[in-house]
Amino acid sequence: MKKIIACPRTFSSDALNVLLKLTSKRSPKTEKTEAHCRKYIQALAAKNEKPFPNPEKDVRQPVEDCSVDGMQTFVWGISTDPDQPVILYLHGGAYMNQPVSFHFKMVSHIAAGIGAKVCFPVYPKIPVHDHKETYTKLKTLYEQVIAVHKPENVIFMGDSSGAGLALGFACRMGKAMKSCTMPSKT
């Protein structure tokens, strides 16, 4: 297992505080609840480092499982139409949970409605990884997408924390990643 990044007041520490509050029904933070939460977060971190199962049963069509800069990425709905919309979907889960069936079904339904291809990265999660690593991998994915598709046909989409990640990535691209071509819509 990779080393867990320890930083003062980060998503990792905030997540731990939330878990402590949720697991401490009668009393505030105790050594027992803190140990329980740390064990839970370590188990979650180990689980997040393993490959995610292919979601073909959820999207009901063939799904390519590929690696983009070491980031597992699922792709489906591929067509020969050069103007096909592409949804780059970032799932929610508090930046630390893997996607669930709902994420795949929802984006698949939306994509079918507009005839879009879906790129669904299983992005790096806290507490092992940070936003800088995630943004770097997303930039590589985005560059691969626009090498084949027009930037104006790319749609950044996400739910919950994934929506925040998509918005943050779009803002970061606009400010710090001047070499990237921006999509016309986010």
Question: Which residues fall in each region the model found?
Answer:
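A glycine/proline-hinged amphipathic helix-loop "lid/cap" segment
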Residues: 1-79
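Short strand-loop-helix active-site module centered on a catalytic nucleophile
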Residues: 73, 88, 110, 131-185
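Short beta-strand element of the alpha/beta-hydrolase
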Residues: 83-93
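Serine-hydrolase catalytic-loop signature spanning alpha/beta hydrolases and amidase-signature enzymes
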Residues: 94-97, 102, 118, 144
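Short, small-residue-enriched loops and turns at beta-alpha junctions
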Residues: 96, 127-128
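Short, conserved loop/turn and helix-capping segments at secondary-structure boundaries
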Residues: 100-104, 132-135
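Short amphipathic alpha-helix adjacent to the substrate-entry channel of hydrolases
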Residues: 101-119
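Short beta-to-alpha linker loops that shape the active-site pocket of alpha/beta-hydrolase fold enzymes
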Residues: 122-126
